[in-house]
């Protein structure tokens, strides 16, 4: 019986599917699996279920002589050396679409949280209390009728746009390609990055990471933004130079920021935690029961297909 190694606990629905077909070994230690344990686990495995926080590099891949598939539990896959896996004739898969609704909801939740100062207000109410309603007390910004600029109009970005439409927002987007069908569907307008930054009240990053996008948002980009603008990153941390972000916030170049992903994740750049106009969450974009269960089904089904001689559905390194 072929062995499947899982680099961290996944929901039972996918785990049980795998156990019906294969010998399954799962890392159940605390925290992220260390490299030595990972290499020991995969050395005789036909499949690896990798977690987004697990680095699957050349050394790990070389330690697994029987490996046929790396099924990455996450929509992203920049934690896996996909090119080297292809050289070794190993399929790498991911879990797209399962994260769409959950991450779009979280993105828009961050928009509302930072604009209406919800987290800040919760903290105040719990610690100091307040004297009651007053005309100038604790004002934030309305979202309705404003302009949202979406960096990356993929599945998640499009879902964010649909939610923005319900708030009567004007929708700008940028990316490598204009998507005219999406424009008609959701009423979005394609612009270049600088135009988006200059005009958007809320800038959401929903793009997947690649090296070309590293520090796409840096010192010069913050200078283009409105002083009342908010930056929301629910895509990938390294797209933003967080040192430049902290300075932009401290210098009041922008109004605020909300982050679910970080440049040096899981570390959070010094300065972000101490700023009241920043909302930070621990990478929970798709952390819903529904999304995580669906993701476990996807990695299980693609693993089953591959080890049964079929083509997995979501290969990212064809």
UniProtKB/Swiss-Prot annotation:
* Top-rank EC class of the record's enzyme: oxidoreductase
Catalytic site residues?
A: 236, 265, 283
| Protein known as | Putative 2-hydroxyacid dehydrogenase SH0752
List residues binding NAD(+): 155-156, 234-236, 260, 283-286
The UniProt entry's sequence similarity note says: Belongs to the D-isomer specific 2-hydroxyacid dehydrogenase family.
Keywords from the UniProt entry: NAD, Oxidoreductase
Determine the domain of life of the protein's source. Bacteria
Please give the InterPro entries that the UniProt record associates with this protein: D-2-hydroxyacid_DH, D-isomer_2_OHA_DH_cat_dom, D-isomer_DH_CS, D-isomer_DH_NAD-bd, NAD(P)-bd_dom_sf
This entry's Gene Ontology molecular function terms read:
NAD binding; oxidoreductase activity, acting on the CH-OH group of donors, NAD or NADP as acceptor
């Amino acid at each position: 019986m072929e062995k499947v190694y899982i680099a961290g606990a996944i929901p039972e629905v996918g785990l049980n599917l795998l156990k019906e077909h294969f010998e399954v070994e799962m890392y159940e230690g605390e925290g992220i699996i260390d490299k030595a344990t990972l290499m020991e686990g995969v050395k005789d495995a036909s499949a690896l279920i990798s977690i987004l926080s697990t680095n699957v590099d050349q050394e790990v891949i070389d330690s697994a002589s029987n490996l046929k598939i790396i099924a990455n539990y996450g929509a992203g896959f920049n934690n896996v050396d996909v090119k080297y896996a292809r050289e070794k004739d190993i399929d790498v898969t991911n879990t797209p679409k399962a994260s769409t609704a959950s991450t779009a909801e979280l993105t828009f939740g961050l928009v509302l949280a930072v604009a209406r100062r919800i987290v800040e207000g919760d903290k105040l109410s719990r610690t100091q209390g307040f004297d009651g309603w007053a005309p100038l007390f604790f004002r934030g910004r309305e979202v309705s009728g404003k302009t949202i600029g979406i960096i990356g109009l993929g599945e998640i970005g499009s879902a964010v746009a649909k939610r923005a439409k319900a708030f009567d927002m004007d929708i700008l987007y940028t990316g490598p390609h204009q998507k005219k069908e999406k424009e008609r569907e959701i009423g979005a307008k394609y612009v270049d990055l600088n135009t988006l930054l200059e005009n958007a009240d809320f800038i959401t990053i929903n793009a997947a990471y690649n090296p070309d996008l590293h520090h796409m948002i840096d010192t010069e980009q913050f200078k283009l933004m409105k002083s009342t603008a908010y930056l929301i990153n629910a895509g990938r941390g390294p797209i933003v130079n967080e040192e430049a972000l902290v300075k932009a916030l401290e210098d009041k170049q922008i109004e605020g920021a909300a982050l679910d992903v970080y440049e040096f994740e899981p570390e959070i750049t010094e300065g972000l935690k101490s700023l009241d106009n920043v909302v930070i969450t621990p990478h929970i974009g798709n952390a819903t029961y529904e999304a995580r269960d669906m993701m476990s089904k996807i990695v299980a089904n693609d693993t089953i297909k591959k080890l049964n001689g079929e083509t997995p559905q979501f290969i990212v390194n064809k």
